[in-house]
Each structure stands twice: as structure tokens, then as C-alpha cells.
Amino acid sequence: TPKLRLTRRASTNFISLWQKSIFGRTLTEIKADGSMVQFFIDSLVPIINECVGYHISSGNWAIVTTPMRRHREHNFASRIAEGIGNTLGIPFYFDCAHCQSKQRVGAVFLPNNIPTEPNVIVFDDFVTTGSTLLAMKNLLHEHQKNTVFITGINNKL
């Protein structure tokens, strides 16, 4: 049973579905298991519907992820966000932002593929410090976007 958690970290509020890890698996194991993509989608879509609304429409809402730093192909978070977007009927904007460094804390993101929709769901698969979410918040707010932050796993107790 999902246990939602609203967390404020790095001056950003986000909703997470799981705390720490799923079934005692490491984050690397979770990302390597292709079936976990659909598991995340199936688990997160009802939560998004309940938190944001059941009548999310294309033209008003979009979904993005935080910048990809390591796995540019078959990126776990991007695959989940794209599946969520398809299920909800809203566009997924691939590569919304770029990060010039691999640093997570204090990162500054550059715009790349900013949604035209006014409301944006920012999805991140795993959150630890919240710095990545803060950088996305700063970027999207500069572009006058309303943001809702949804994460799969809150990786910090």
C-alpha cells in the first residue's frame, strides 16, 4: 500500500510515494529492472489524479523530468514520465533542462525544451537532498510555470 509523504527539502515541496527503497532493493537494482518502469507508472498515475485532479488536460498540463546526468539512453525517470504523460493524456517534454555539471547540489539548469503549458508536473525517480528539484523550480518559475513535484522514492529518512 502506498504511503504518500509530503516533504519540504531545499525550499521545495514534493510528494513521494515510497520512503527509502522498494522491497529492500538497491536503487541500482530498481533502475536495472525494466518491469519497474510500469510499476512506477501504475503506482503514480492514481496519486497524480488524486493530488492534481482527474481532469488533467493536454494544453493545460505537461510533465517533465530533471536533467539526465548519467544514463542518456533508456533513462529510468524519462521512461516513467513519458508513460505517465501517455496515461494521463498530457505531453512529456524530453530534455526540458540541461545541466552543465554532474554536481547535484547547487546546480543551475539551463532551459532547453520548456513546456508551453502553464502547469508542469516535475517528476524525479529518486530524491535525496532536493537540490535538483529546487533547480528545476527556479528554472520553471523563471518561465512563469506552475509546478507540482512528484517523486517515486524519497531516499532520505
Show the residue positions of the predicted features:
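Active-site-facing substrate-recognition patch
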Residues: T1-S57, W61, C96-N119, T129, ...
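Short, solvent-exposed loop/turn segments at secondary-structure junctions
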Residues: M68-H71, N154-K156
